[in-house]
């Protein structure tokens, strides 16, 4: 036991010891032998291994670790793995920026490639500034950088004190993850749950890839309404649009069927301005009479509503935007006039922004622009990781059915969600709203490089064209496989790309196709059947509320499609971290705080205290300039060490027994501690770590401020039943407090526990009420009454501007007879702590210090 306990250095000291001792290892054989009920399994969220963690990660992962430590102390065999989400766009972008490269699949592999910014910090993300390299070279760089990032992440998690079993890790780009992802996909295909379709697709022009509904976010953007005249037999028809550049792609005008203004036009045709194409006027219930002029143009494609109208009204496709976000060179066939084609030629090859400016000038010149554009701000769809608005292009993609167009599947997903215990419960409604609001099946193919290859080939017909309706699937035992480098079953590599041969699928899976299988990846699905049976269904899925629509929903979907069983029994959802202005912290807003410096400056226990002080689903403010809660947590951890050192300074009997606690004050403290144990246990059972911490902390300060002060003179005294009673009560309380705080303050609790115990506090049994319960409802009152009397004595000294160590010649305490009787039973303790020579009592309505006479210091001391 050190002379002066300190928090500094505890993370390294105990982190190393836990690793050496295997404190948190999951014993697979013992767990299988004990059965599923003896295991507590956690579907840990794999953080994206691309860059740095932020304070929000520390916040939510601490919540999970508190649960893991609590369950371990309850005697459960805790399966607490860690994964790294290291495939997908975030990794690709980081590699591009870090090494100054970009992937060009047409280039050959270059052995021993040295990227231009090897080990540097390239700030540019412009393709023009990056060296093009082959796909294989690019993937090698992705592998290299993610491994380094993961080492840094693990070091930070260890310093935070996560009780993860570091032998149970996986990477979403690792070989087993590839195999599992491809196996699950093949089964989706064979059951008809995964399919291909040529359809309008949300497209990010920067990354040149399709994007799923779950990856969208709205961002307010400046725009303008342009009032434009179409020409009909009865005269002009005015529409208002924010996208005049799509006039060449217009296929119809649409109005609400009940809008009397336009009912006479329904079934007629009008001519588009500038381009001179005849288009029909149609009716649809999604048209908004109160928006703009009440009649809108349908283009292929300006937004999702255009896609709905196009599909449901069976309209032609006249798409004009290419994969690069520029206007394609060939005009739609419907533009058949010389003037129309000349106008279109002015747009070809331009960006959407430039094309818009050109069309506005053409409209102004033709007289079809009415007035000037009216500036507005409106929400525009972006890929959540993208920088430019999404476009909609027609592409062939792979999809997985998700209930958007299958009512039976949608209802099964809703019921599956209702079978899970949500913490907090209102998060279930968000899940159901997402399921009910889906507009299309899950688009799972991505036109990227670093991801799980879609394990499919296509036969080529006599003309060398892919036969997409007859995909070639690999044997399950051949997985994992990359169709871009492995020949299709029944073919040789020489037949690749040849008529009558085959071509490999070049797309990769959406990263969520792998992340949606985290229970299977960690638990050994179709790799270790005994382990999977021991941990599945998992007890807990912890995560952030912002990825309900992605990670949580997709995991439920994959489980429903695979076996119809919910993958976990509990879902715990953390709130957001907000800045002092209550704005959500995010990388895009530039207000993210990285945790390494915070942990270094304040210590891990203090940061964990801040995180654990917030309930699930509740946002927490973080001010790096004045982290008040973290400072409170540090003070608490130091107090725990100091209290332990103080208590352990008293010699205690070799064995502790409740029967040795005979003094009413001591018994009162233990009975109140019993209530704390009961309440904290119930709170943690209900996934309310904040209430458990608050309950424990509140009584701990009462224990330190009142009880310790009241009994220390007796504990210091000569051996007697009263002295033994105090010391035994103190030791019992310390044992309970260290275990109660252990899930939140693991380093301080371990340090103090090891001063007088063998083994780790984190493998000790969670405190039980029976350990400290002395029985009797009256026992609780003694400490409360003595505490109030002590507060009165302290208050009187403070009012007299005297030190708390100032002796008291005499004090009179007034109060009800019952309270006075309690105080008289512990009068010696009160006299000692208050330094009171004479203590008298008198009847009164309320407990109070009626009179106090402080000892006057000698003249020379004044």
Curated annotation (Swiss-Prot):
Q: What class of enzyme is it?
A: ligase
Residue numbers binding ATP: 587
Q: Where is this region: Disordered?
A: 110-130
Q: Which NCBIfam families match?
A: alt_ValS, PRK13208.1
Its keywords, alphabetically, are: Aminoacyl-tRNA synthetase, ATP-binding, Cytoplasm, Ligase, Nucleotide-binding, Protein biosynthesis
Q: What is this protein called?
A: Valine--tRNA ligase
Q: Which domain of life is it from?
A: Bacteria
Q: Which organism is it from?
A: Leifsonia xyli subsp. xyli (strain CTCB07)
Catalysis: reaction(s): tRNA(Val) + L-valine + ATP = L-valyl-tRNA(Val) + AMP + diphosphate
Residue span of motif 'HIGH' region: 47-57
What GO molecular functions are on record for this protein? Answer: aminoacyl-tRNA deacylase activity; ATP binding; valine-tRNA ligase activity
Q: Where in the cell is it found?
A: Cytoplasm
Briefly, what is this protein's role?
Answer: Catalyzes the attachment of valine to tRNA(Val). As ValRS can inadvertently accommodate and process structurally similar amino acids such as threonine, to avoid such errors, it has a 'posttransfer' editing activity that hydrolyzes mischarged Thr-tRNA(Val) in a tRNA-dependent manner.
Q: List cellular component terms (GO).
A: cytosol
Q: Where is the composition biased (Basic and acidic residues)?
A: 120-129
Instruction: List the Pfam families hit by this protein, alphabetically.
Output: Anticodon_1, tRNA-synt_1
* The keyword Hydrolase is assigned to this record: no
- EC number(s) for this protein? 6.1.1.9
Q: Which family does it belong to?
A: Belongs to the class-I aminoacyl-tRNA synthetase family. ValS type 2 subfamily.
| Residue numbers covered by motif 'KMSKS' region | 584-588
């Amino acid at each position: 036991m050190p002379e002066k306990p300190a928090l500094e250095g505890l993370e390294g000291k105990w982190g190393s010891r836990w690793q050496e001792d295997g404190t948190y290892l999951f014993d697979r054989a013992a767990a299988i032998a004990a059965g599923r009920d003896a295991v507590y399994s956690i579907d840990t969220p794999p953080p994206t291994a691309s860059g740095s963690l932020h304070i929000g990660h520390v916040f939510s992962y601490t919540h999970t670790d508190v649960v893991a430590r609590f369950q371990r102390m309850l005697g459960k065999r805790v399966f607490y793995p860690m994964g790294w989400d290291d495939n997908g766009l975030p990794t690709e972008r980081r590699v591009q920026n870090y090494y100054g490269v970009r992937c060009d699949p047409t280039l050959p592999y270059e052995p021993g490639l040295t990227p231009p910014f090897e080990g540097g910090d390239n700030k540019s993300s412009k393709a023009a500034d990056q060296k093009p390299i082959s796909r294989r070279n690019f993937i090698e760089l992705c592998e290299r950088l993610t491994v380094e990032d993961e080492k840094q992440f693990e070091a930070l998690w260890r310093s935070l004190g996560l009780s993860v079993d570091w032998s149970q890790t996986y990477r979403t780009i690792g070989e087993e993850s590839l195999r599992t992802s491809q196996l699950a996909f093949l089964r989706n295909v064979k059951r008809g749950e995964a399919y291909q379709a040529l359809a309008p697709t949300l497209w990010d022009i920067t990354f040149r890839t399709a994007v799923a509904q779950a990856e969208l976010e709205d961002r307010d953007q400046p725009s303008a309404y342009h009032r434009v005249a179409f020409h009909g037999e009865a005269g002009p028809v005015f529409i208002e649009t924010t996208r005049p550049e799509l006039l060449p792609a217009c296929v119809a005008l649409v109005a609400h069927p009940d809008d009397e203004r336009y009912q006479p036009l329904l079934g007629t045709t009008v001519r588009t301005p500038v381009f001179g194409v005849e288009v029909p006027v149609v009716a649809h219930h999604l048209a908004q009479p109160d928006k703009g002029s009440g009649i809108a143009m349908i283009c292929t494609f300006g937004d999702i509503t255009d896609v709905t109208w196009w599909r449901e009204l069976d309209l032609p496709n006249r798409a004009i935007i290419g994969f690069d976000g520029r206007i394609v060179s060939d005009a739609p066939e419907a533009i058949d006039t010389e003037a129309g084609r000349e106008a279109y030629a002015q747009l070809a090859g331009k960006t959407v922004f430039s094309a818009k400016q050109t069309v506005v000038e053409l409209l102004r010149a033709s007289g079809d622009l009415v007035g000037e554009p009216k500036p507005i701000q409106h929400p525009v769809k972006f890929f959540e990781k993208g920088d430019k608005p999404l476009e909609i292009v027609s592409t062939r993609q792979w999809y997985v059915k998700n209930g958007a167009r299958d009512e039976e599947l949608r209802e099964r997903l809703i019921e599956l969600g209702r079978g899970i215990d949500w913490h907090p419960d209102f998060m279930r409604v968000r899940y159901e709203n997402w399921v009910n609001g889906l507009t299309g099946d899950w688009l799972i193919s991505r036109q990227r490089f670093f991801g799980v290859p879609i394990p499919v080939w296509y036969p080529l017909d006599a003309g060398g064209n892919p036969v997409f309706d007859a995909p070639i699937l690999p044997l399950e035992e051949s997985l994992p496989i990359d169709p871009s480098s492995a020949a299709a079953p029944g073919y040789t590599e020489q037949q690749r790309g040849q008529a009558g041969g085959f071509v490999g699928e070049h797309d990769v899976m959406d990263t969520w196709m792998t992340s949606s299988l985290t229970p299977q990846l960690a638990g050994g699905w179709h790799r270790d059947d005994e382990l999977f049976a021991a941990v599945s269904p998992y007890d807990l899925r912890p995560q952030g509320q912002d990825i309900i629509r992605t990670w949580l929903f997709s995991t439920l979907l994959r489980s429903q499609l695979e076996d119809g069983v919910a993958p976990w029994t509990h879902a715990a959802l953390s709130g957001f971290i907000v800045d002092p202005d209550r704005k959500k912290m995010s990388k895009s807003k530039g207000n993210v705080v990285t945790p390494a410096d915070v942990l270094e400056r304040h210590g891990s226990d203090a940061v964990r205290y801040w995180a654990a002080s917030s309930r699930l689903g509740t946002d927490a403010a973080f001010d790096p300039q004045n982290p008040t809660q973290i400072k409170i947590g540090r003070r608490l951890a130091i107090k725990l060490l100091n209290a332990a050192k103080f208590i352990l300074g008293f010699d205690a009997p070799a064995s502790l027994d409740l029967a040795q606690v005979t003094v009413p004050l001591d018994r009162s403290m233990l009975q109140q501690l019993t209530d704390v144990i009961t309440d904290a246990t119930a709170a943690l059972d209900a996934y309310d770590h904040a209430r458990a911490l608050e309950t424990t902390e509140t009584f701990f300060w009462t224990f330190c401020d009142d009880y310790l002060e009241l009994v220390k003179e007796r504990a210091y005294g000569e051996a007697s039943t009263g002295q033994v009673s105090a010391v035994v009560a103190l030791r019992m309380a310390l044992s309970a407090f260290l275990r109660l705080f252990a899930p939140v303050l693991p380093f301080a609790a371990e340090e103090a526990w090891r001063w007088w115990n063998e083994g780790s506090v984190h493998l000790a049994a969670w405190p039980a009420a029976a350990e400290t319960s002395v029985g009797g409802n009256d026992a609780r009152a003694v400490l409360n009454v003595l505490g109030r009397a002590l507060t009165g004595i302290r208050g009187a000294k403070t009012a007299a501007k005297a030190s708390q160590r100032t002796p008291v010649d005499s004090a009179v305490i007034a109060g009800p007879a019952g309270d006075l009787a309690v105080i008289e039973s512990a009068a010696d303790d009160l006299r000692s702590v208050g330094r009171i020579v004479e203590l008298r009592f008198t009847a009164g309505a309320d407990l109070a210090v009626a009179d106090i006479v402080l000892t006057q210091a000698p003249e020379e001391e004044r």
